Amino acid sequence: MERNFVLSCCSTVDLPYAYMARRDIPVLFYHYVVGDQEYVDDMGRDPAALPRFYGFLKEGKLPQTSQVNVAAYLDFFEEQLKKGDLLHIAFTSGQSGSVHNAMTAGKLLQEKYPDKKIVVIDSLCSSSGYGLLVDTAADMRDSGATLEETAQWVLDNRNKVHHQFFSSDMTQFRRTGRVSGAAAMVATIMNICPIMRLDDKGAIKAYGKVRGKKKAVVTTVNAMEEHAQGGRDYDQKCFVCHSQCPEDARMLIDALEERFPKLKGKIRLCDIGTIIGSHSGPGTVAVFFMGDERPAMD
């Protein structure tokens, strides 16, 4: 299929690489480091990569992530420009400064190739919510929308992609300093699951806590009903992802399909990749959907 422009993104979309390849969406891969060894956030290309990563966490090793530098973006963008004009949707600035390097690279290449269109957009989205935004942009591209039309849709709708999630394992939150050791211990003893979402700047915010996974699922489903476009009649894209807890993800999907009948059999299930997993750790389950404008949160 001939397309009007190239649409690209980063590996933190937490969708399978094979799916992105089928959709003709080039991906810039993030990396993480354990000890003195660097590993790629490979999106399922190597079946051993994700178990190896979570094995590191189980051993108490702390993966280090870093921003993608300008040089890496220059190389990636220049390769894409061989195929046409470029729209790159970047990982949220609320969790990484990489988008600023992407924008710098875009400006440098715009000067080098003045006849090309190069647009870089901060997605304000993360994980498979970021994936949902990119996937919908690909639908527009494939339906014949121009780069400008697609970019404007992304800008208008990026803050309508809701990210609702909970975690039943506070270990990695403690290791990365997001919660204190005492708070993590109490949460574990009391079986407390923090309820979280992304704010309007694409940053993670905790806004509640419940005891037990079942209550966490109900709270998450209630939040989706409150914010989803159409309420219980929601019938747009819906992605669920998890970090090494498929049974919990299945429990959430079952509850979503019961509450939102038009989603039955249509929810895409994905793994949380190594970059997002470096911060969430195991035991996190999330749902992503289109809704009203995400609120600002202190």
Regions found by a protein language model. Give the residues of each.
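N-terminal glycine-rich anion-binding loop in soluble enzyme alpha/beta folds
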Residues: 6-68, 72
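N-terminal glycine-rich phosphate/adenylate-binding segment common to multiple enzyme folds
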Residues: 72-99
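Ligand-binding "clamshell"
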Residues: 64, 115-119
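Mixed-charge interfacial surface used for oligomerization/domain docking
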Residues: 2-4, 12-33, 37, 87, ...
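A short glycine/small-residue-enriched secondary-structure motif
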Residues: 47-54, 77, 81, 108
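Arginine/glycine-rich "motif VI" loop of SF2 helicases in the C-terminal RecA-like domain
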Residues: 111
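Short coil/turn segments at secondary-structure boundaries
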Residues: 60-68, 90-97, 124-125
